[in-house]
Regions:
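Post-signal peptide N-terminal segment of mature Sec-exported envelope proteins
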Residues: 33-52
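Bacterial N-terminal signal peptides that target proteins for export
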Residues: 1-13
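C-terminal motif of bacterial Sec signal peptides marking the signal peptidase cleavage site
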Residues: 20-23
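Bacterial signal peptide processing site
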Residues: 25-28
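A surface/extracellular/periplasmic glyco- and lipid-processing/surface-interacting theme
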Residues: 35, 53-92, 101-110, 115-354
Length: 354
């Protein structure tokens, strides 16, 4: 009786048949169609990482692990003798001194790290103020101005808080005569910050990471006095106070003080030679309103820690920060602390360093 082939024999026969067919196929490899399957990429639907928290106050460079998220607050402050001593100048992070009509000066005082209760006397805005304040994307408080000047503030991305428009925070101080009697409460000004102003300002200058490492301190020459003549009628002096570790301000030769009698001082004094031109606009007395040309370039000096160094300044646009460059072509590092900036008109103003 013949036996039926088993499964193993059947499988061997099938394999042999397949090999035989392959041998008859012309000897070339058999093309096997392929299909590309695109990879599936899962989108990261999580929130973007939060920016790193600041480790220093942006307008002073002073280290801190608790930098407030409030915006920068700039306030126009008067500097006539009737306005002195002004409230709040001693608490400002940065103060700009500018020449206005008649050769008098006014301040743009900028607050962020400190919150003085009261500031003033407050006065009106001027054509150069947008270029000073715009890089901080903050608030500018002032009493009023001609319409084109106010429009320029808004066009620069700055929020205006204006007494003449009924905004909160302004009051008239008893015992002072107009127009030297308008003061303001910083808490009320900050409370009106709009939804675009919920972050601290960007740094306006570069600061040394530790004390004594500023550019003037490490590479400058000793300085005892900066004598700044802004006009025929306005003169500021800054003398180095070794005991105080700061430059001390005088109006002319008279010490400048706060309402409490404390001397006004600065860790850094920046003196810049700037172009000043007359606008087509006039003040109520008929004098042309001047404008300091903030966009451009020029020379100057930076003084820190009893030393001074020559610098070049440049500013590319209204909303661009002012850049200070040292003799080596590198960016100037300021010492940590308050900075005062003197805008000295070329030709009509001057300064000496001794």
């Amino acid at each position: 009786m013949a036996r039926k082939p088993g499964r193993a024999a059947w499988a061997a026969t099938m394999v042999a048949g397949v090999l035989a067919l392959a041998a008859c196929g012309g000897g070339g490899p058999t093309d096997v169609p392929t299909r590309t399957v695109p990879a599936t990429v899962e989108a990261d639907k999580g929130a973007p990482p939060s920016p790193a928290a600041p480790t220093a106050w942006p307008l002073t460079g002073v280290p801190s692990d608790d930098v407030a998220t409030r915006p920068a607050l700039a306030v126009k402050i008067e500097n006539l003798p009737q306005a002195r001593p002004q409230a709040g100048l001693d608490a400002a992070d940065i103060v700009w001194e500018e020449v206005v009509e008649g050769g008098i000066t006014r301040f743009v005082a900028v607050y962020h790290s400190k919150t003085p209760e009261t500031v003033g006397p407050i006065r009106s805005v001027r054509p150069m103020d947008p270029a000073i304040v715009a890089p901080m994307h903050g608030i500018l408080a002032y009493t009023g101005a001609q319409k084109p000047f106010i429009e320029a503030v808004g066009a620069a991305g700055i929020q205006s808080i204006i007494m003449d428009k009924g905004d909160d925070g302004f009051y008239k101080q008893k015992g002072k005569r107009a127009p030297h009697n308008v003061f303001g409460r910083t808490s009320d000004f900050w409370a009106q910050a709009d939804d675009d102003r919920t972050s601290p300002p960007p740094a306006q200058f570069a600061y040394a990471s530790s004390e004594g490492q500023g550019t003037a301190t490490t590479a400058g020459a000793p300085v005892a006095l900066l004598d700044v003549r802004l006009s025929a009628s306005s003169r500021a002096q800054w003398s180095w106070g070794a005991d105080e570790g700061a430059f001390l301000r005088s109006e002319g030769t008279k010490p400048a003080v706060s309402p409490d009698g404390d001397r006004l001082s600065a860790a850094n004094v920046v003196v810049l030679s700037v172009e000043m031109t007359n606008t087509k606009f006039k003040d109520p007395a008929g004098a042309f309103v001047p404008e300091t040309q903030m966009v451009g370039t020029g020379e100057g000096v930076v003084a820190s820690a009893g030393k001074q160094v020559a610098v070049t300044w440049s500013k590319d646009g209204v909303e661009a920060p002012l850049v200070l460059t040292g003799p080596d072509g590198g960016r100037v590092l300021l010492e940590q602390g308050a900075t005062w900036i003197e805008l000295v008109p070329r030709g009509s103003g001057s300064y000496t360093v001794s």
